[in-house]
Amino acid sequence: MSVKWEKQEGNVGKLTFEIEQEKVKEGLDRAFVKVRKTLNVPGFRKGKVPRQIFNQRFGEEALYQDALDILLPEVYSAAIDEAGIDPVDTPQVNIESMEKGETWVLTAEVTVKPEVKLGDYKGLEVEKRETELTTEELEAELKQLQERQAELVVKEDAPAENGDTVILDFEGFKDGVAFEGGQAENHSLELGSGQFIPGFEEKLVGLKAGDEADIELTFPEEYHAEDLAGQPVVFKVKLHEIKTKEVPALDDELAKDIDEEVETLDELKEKISKRLQEAKEESVAQAKQEEVIAKAVENAEVDIPHAMVHHEADHLMNHFAQDLQAQGLTPELYYQFTGQTEEAMHAQMEKDAEKRVKMNLVLEAIAEAENIEPTEEAIDEEISTLAEKYGMEKDAVRAALGDMSELKSDLKIRKAIDVLLDSAVEK
């Protein structure tokens, strides 16, 4: 096969390749078998017309497009292999020559994977982070657990304070007219939680059960409902009940309520300390990894094709839709609730996608620069891990992974990250 690759502007180039007559004949034969099944020709049973009769009635050229559709995936794949290019998008294929009895000549406009110009990626300075759990961190966690065990107790003849939970009716009015979605009865609200627009909860502080009040507010300019954004409104409220948190003492009894596997507060503290220490070490390691990768990416230069960003954004959108589905929502409902559009969401996803694409390209380039290749032992170990995780046999995992290209790529990137981490300097 004759193949010619001409690099053009950016990451786009022109690939010229041929389909020789022997291959063309094979494609025409396969196309005829496919087309013949659908033909009704007088004098012949459906699907039984001879090739010679077909050519006489319709001409062999009638098979050219079907033959090309059959041959193109195979010959294009062979052409890009021979040219040594790595396409990142579906090509635009053009027919240059398709004459009877001659070699077919095709060209394709191909967007290829960009070259990465690496900057410094070894010996990068990163922040030195404390990994030891502090007394304050342990006490904060214990306080949270203590608060979760708190009971709400009705406050008698006392004003509402931040942290209290109030039961109230409210109705919102704009220009004296009640607006949609601005009313509720016997609504439970924790003051200071920030559930309502700024100012609403603050103006409930100091009221007592049975009090009624008019609360004058202005909706934020960025509020999702356009008819209310930046508009002055009045909420008529009536407090029915005020409840305050009654926090239990931090003692052995509470420790047993929090974790039935412990008998004393000291045992609970020890167990929580171990969990928090492990979590902190993991968090510090993750932060270090993110920082060193970000610096290596910042130091690199790469012209990213928009096609790669667009595909990655599509991938993120699909994941987003799956996450919504797991919560019992659809994208349409989400857009309705938030006032956002699918186009705006995709544009937002493209910003994240561009960062992810550049990061992966840079890490792949580092792996190549370091001549990183996963060993058979590492591949087998990863397959064992996946088999255990998904409850599958190793052979089944191997079959599902096919040529292992994705697994090998993942392992190479992990090793590239190790290169960054091992050489990083904490300061």
UniProtKB/Swiss-Prot annotation:
Keywords: Cell cycle, Cell division, Chaperone, Cytoplasm, Isomerase, Rotamase. It is found in: Cytoplasm. It catalyses: [protein]-peptidylproline (omega=180) = [protein]-peptidylproline (omega=0). It is an enzyme of class 5 (isomerase). GO terms for molecular function: peptidyl-prolyl cis-trans isomerase activity; protein folding chaperone; ribosome binding. GO terms for cellular component: cytoplasm. It comes from the Bacteria. Residues 163-248 form the PPIase FKBP-type domain. One of its GO terms (biological process) is protein transport. The keyword Cell cycle applies. InterPro entries: PPIase_dom_sf, PPIase_FKBP_dom, Trig_fac, Trigger_fac_C, Trigger_fac_C_sf, Trigger_fac_ribosome-bd_bac, Trigger_fac_ribosome-bd_sf, Trigger_fact/SurA_dom_sf. Its EC number is 5.2.1.8. It holds the Pfam family FKBP_C. Its main location: cytoplasm. HAMAP family: Trigger_factor_Tig. Belongs to the FKBP-type PPIase family. Tig subfamily. NCBIfam families: tig. Consists of 3 domains; the N-terminus binds the ribosome, the middle domain has PPIase activity, while the C-terminus has intrinsic chaperone activity on its own. Involved in protein export. Acts as a chaperone by maintaining the newly synthesized protein in an open conformation. Functions as a peptidyl-prolyl cis-trans isomerase. This is Trigger factor. It comes from Listeria monocytogenes serotype 4a (strain HCC23).
